[in-house]
């Protein structure tokens, strides 16, 4: 079995389910902000294609969560609440953290850019007022395409690369990371 086949193992998600998941996530974020009045870390995955949740995608999310929690511990940022969701729309995780929102964004953006799987993670920071902080505010460039390093949004919008090519690259990155972890 090809490694990309493992990315396809799972149920396809509909556009309606993706929109519902986004709405539920936003509601949970509002609820957490009202309850804790702290910045939130919100993790989703960059998972092209119809299958957003499989054993492989859940491992990718688990790696991200472990890295985020380790970074928070290293910085002595206290995680006062967290929740994880595993729906067909993909693994999600969020946490309310006692930390300055801009510092969270800076460190999470660095993690996304420096970790071998970081390009597969979408780590959003929402400040205690409910404002989502952008990479641009930190002077960071747009997220690069998995294939050609151009602006990922432009490549996605223009459909510059096939789904198979994207999934091959994602599978390669995951394989390399897991192989190196075991060595």
Regions found by a protein language model. Give the residues of each.
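Helix-adjacent hinge/juxtasegments
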Residues: 75-107
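Long, contiguous binding/interaction regions
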Residues: 1-71, 86, 103-183
């Amino acid at each position: 079995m090809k490694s990309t086949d493992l990315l396809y193992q799972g149920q396809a998600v509909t556009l309606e389910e993706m929109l519902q998941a986004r709405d539920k996530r936003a509601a949970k974020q509002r609820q957490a902000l009202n309850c804790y009045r702290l910045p939130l870390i919100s993790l989703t995955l960059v998972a092209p294609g119809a299958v957003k949740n499989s054993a492989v995608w859940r491992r990718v999310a688990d790696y991200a969560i472990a890295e985020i929690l380790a970074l928070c511990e290293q910085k002595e940022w206290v995680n006062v609440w967290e929740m994880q969701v595993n729906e067909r729309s993909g693994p999600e995780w969020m946490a309310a953290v006692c930390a300055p929102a801009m510092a969270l964004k800076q460190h999470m953006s660095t993690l996304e850019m420096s970790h071998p799987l970081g390009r597969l993670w979408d780590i959003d920071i929402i400040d205690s007022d409910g404002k989502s902080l952008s990479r641009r505010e930190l002077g960071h460039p747009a997220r690069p395409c998995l294939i050609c390093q151009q602006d990922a949004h432009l490549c996605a919008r223009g459909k510059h690369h096939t789904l198979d090519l994207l999934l091959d690259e994602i599978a390669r990155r995951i394989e390399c990371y897991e192989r190196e972890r075991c060595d």
